[in-house]
């Protein structure tokens, strides 16, 4: 009798891990909600009452001069402008689902385009609770030509339905991912007691390609870009479209790719709102290892003080001149390890249960694959090749952003970034997501 838990059949173990990952995602979406169903109406009522209570204390200020509006840009006094209306979101900072930092970055500024890009139409109803007035006519600066052109382009694309994703495309991509993962696991499972260098290499490459492609699906799912419709009910499931997005996003990014979906969502949303802003975009702060813009030096010298700042400057002098040699090795080999570390730290610090479970399942099946290889040197080779294949994704994403200029918050007004889109993107790189600033 062979206990399934101790079974050495890698295919069986991986299948169990895959099913476990799916169940974990479903549990995080459904079971926890069902267990809280009795408290749901009460908590929603309390939250609505709390929101209205906090909003009712806001003083209506009527027409607000733009110069006066721009003074309210701190944690204790945060105002936003959206479509000419002024909102006091100070009491909303800690309850904002996207995190407080993204709001703080737009205190005292026009956040119209950012709000429209990140929120559904249903979310607009919360705005009126925090409105305190309107920008006085003739006091706000006129939007730049680039901003006007961007808004017109966005409206045209929406009307033409070009933001409506094709779910069939993602089903096809998911099948490709599962085929690559299954092929890689099957090759490793066929090794047996005698390890074969060729099989180890092929298995590592196939698994790496599958994880590489899963990252793209996870990216689009966590962006809620796989099914942009589906806010109603389907088979009794409310907001089914958004649940499909989250399910595929969490499953592909956490259970297959092995990173924290919550950490990625928070950082990546902030990245898209302040793309490549020196020393502020959380996904593109690489000092003291790499310098991506001379503007980073200015912010380091003028805004950073203390022992850590001095230590950073010391290592910058040593490492930055070597970045032409360290870029590829660090991006390919260290980048993925760094993602695993910060994902685990984020999930533990913020006690994200579904993140911890999904990352546990990732390590369960991935370590099982490694242990199926008999020889230690072949295990090391497998991990090295797998990281190299996935590392191509890191190199691609970093270079994709390094190729454009950085703009500070002050410079963003009236500027835009254009990218030469000539040529055909290979299948394995899919489509790059646009990077732009107003």
Regions found by a protein language model. Give the residues of each.
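Alpha-helical bilayer-embedded segments of polytopic membrane proteins, i.e.
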Residues: 3, 7-25, 167-214, 253-257, ...
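Divalent metal-coordination and catalytic microenvironments
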Residues: 84, 157, 219, 268-271, ...
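Membrane-embedded catalytic scaffold of the fatty acid hydroxylase/desaturase
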Residues: 204-350, 408-438
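B-type heme-binding environments
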Residues: 3-163
